[in-house]
Amino acid sequence: MQGSRVVTQRGTVAIEELQLGDEVQTIENGNLHMTTFLGWIHKEADHNEQFLKLKTESTQITLSKKHVIFYKPKGRERDAMTTTFADLVEEGDLLKVILNGEVLWERVVDVDRETRKGIYTPLTSAGTILVDNVLASCYADFLFQFVVTSIYYSIPLPQSKSVSQADMAFLPVRLFPWLLDNEESQVKDGLRFYPQLLTWFGTQINMVESYKEESNLITATVSFPLAMLVMGIALRLSF
């Protein structure tokens, strides 16, 4: 959301001030890492939205209810990190944070709701980003529901696996960042063209999910040529 802070090679900036090509701080393999900002998946500077504020022992992150965040459920501290939607995080759950240069887990001590202005969903080459010193993914519910599950699998996936599938869905953007954003489009509001195509793609496959016995075959049969069609349209319209 507007006003959230991220660390770049230019220093700490508000998330809405990110520029194409910025190197942004994230956590990868348990260590601090810089990742490239590729553009906006979704941006609505003047839109009022209800956000969740997740407060930990040292910091807080404010994000949309269906944004995907990394966590460990309360009472399962020894389990591997997984993901969930922000509105499912509860007091006592653990979030991954950076504190004084150290990567650690902190408990959520308060969950609050507030209406604020500005939606900003950045995409980085890592698919993750540190926002206000808390690790979050770059993805929200529409990617999980329509793209990840529908395109790559015909059955629901654990969300931790869905993150890597969302990364796969955006592989063309990582290879050709101009498919998502450019210097002219980055200042404009709205859901970007490429994720719109992914959403449409997912809804088409959702239409055949009622054929449970055939859906795996259908998905395998149509996903590759449809992906090529989507890429072709995107490439065509980008010139």
Q: Model-flagged regions — what are they?
A:
Residues 1-239:
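HINT superfamily self-processing domains
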